[in-house]
């Protein structure tokens, strides 16, 4: 089972009500604004390593969302974070 977590050196900033991922050293090239579900996943991955199944169950328990939509949100979140070097597995 693949476990992922947020790497050290990244944090959230709240800019006018939008949560944005920033690198602590200023090297993140892209601005990443998190949706509500992405923010939830971020907070989940900051606390511990989790599997995709853990993420799915947490979203379904905390949001009024279908399994298909939740899986899509997870895939987009993971792809975006991986492309920007923010998560490790």
Model-flagged regions — what are they?
Residues 30-89:
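Long, charge-rich, low-complexity alpha-helical segments
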């Amino acid at each position: 089972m693949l476990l992922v977590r947020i790497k050290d050196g990244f944090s959230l900033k709240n800019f006018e009500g939008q949560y944005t991922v920033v690198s602590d050293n200023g090297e993140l090239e892209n601005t990443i604004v998190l949706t509500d579900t992405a923010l939830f996943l971020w907070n989940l991955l900051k606390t511990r390593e989790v599997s995709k199944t853990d993420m799915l169950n947490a979203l379904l328990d905390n949001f009024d969302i279908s399994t298909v939509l939740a899986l899509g949100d997870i895939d987009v979140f993971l792809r975006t974070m991986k492309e920007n070097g923010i998560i490790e597995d």
